[in-house]
Amino acid sequence: MYNIKRVNLLGKRFYEVDGFGVFPSVTTVLSTTGDKSGIERWKKRVGQDEAERIAREATDRGSVMHKHLEIYLGQDLKQDKQSLLKSSKEQAVADTEINSFNNKAKDLGEDLFMKFYNNDNFFPSIESTIFQEKFLWFNKSNLGYAGTVDNFSLLKDGSRKVIDFKTAKKPKQDNWIMDYKLQVSAYSIAIWQRHGIKPDGGEIWIANEIDDVPQKFVLSFEEIRFFFELFMQRLKRFEEIKREAEAAGVNI
């Protein structure tokens, strides 16, 4: 068991892994190196206070949905779906993390979870959960990163896949989710390095507030390798930004 500590450096989230080093989180790498022009235009249009409120609500609903998914998929999935739902709802009612949110976030997060439950393209494809909410890190040639993967499961077709859960206000187009693909790829390769298990691919599940049917984007292992190389380019750029900030004595 490794001693892991979350630390704040240069205004960003890093993880200190005892004996290995200090690594930026995957989300820190992506948020720092991504194109922020669209977000900045949106903030200017709606105002800073409104932007913060919307972002906070999105984070809260996502946290609630993630917890419902974690509870549901942490059960013996060989049970019938009605029994699984009954048990998971009983656990959710008593869950301290879910109960820390306001009723609006709890209701919306549960509604988004139920969209996955009500569509047979999602839970029925999973044979069993290998692990979920697992801390991972990767390091090679003085480059490294860390983060927590949502879910890694054995599917009924025999494949093992990283599954990442997302929420959205409206449906996503494939060309809008590049960072999601990079994130799944980073976690997949970290699983391979840390646990010696080569994932067969990845999936991105997105529940949005408009459609009853969530979206599923599927990545092959060949695509994961491709996107991992792109992620490593972003990681190298992040390290350049970090060095510049350290030299200037400012936050990233």
Spans of features found by a protein language model:
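Metal-dependent nuclease catalytic cores that hydrolyze phosphodiester bonds in DNA/RNA
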Residues: 1-146
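DEDD superfamily 3′-5′ metal-dependent exonuclease/proofreading module
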Residues: 2, 100, 155, 240-252
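Short, surface-exposed, charged/polar-biased interaction segments
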Residues: 28-30, 208, 252
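Generic preference for flexible, low-structure residues
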Residues: 81, 85, 215-218, 247, ...
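Mg2+/Mn2+-dependent nuclease catalytic core
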Residues: 130-244
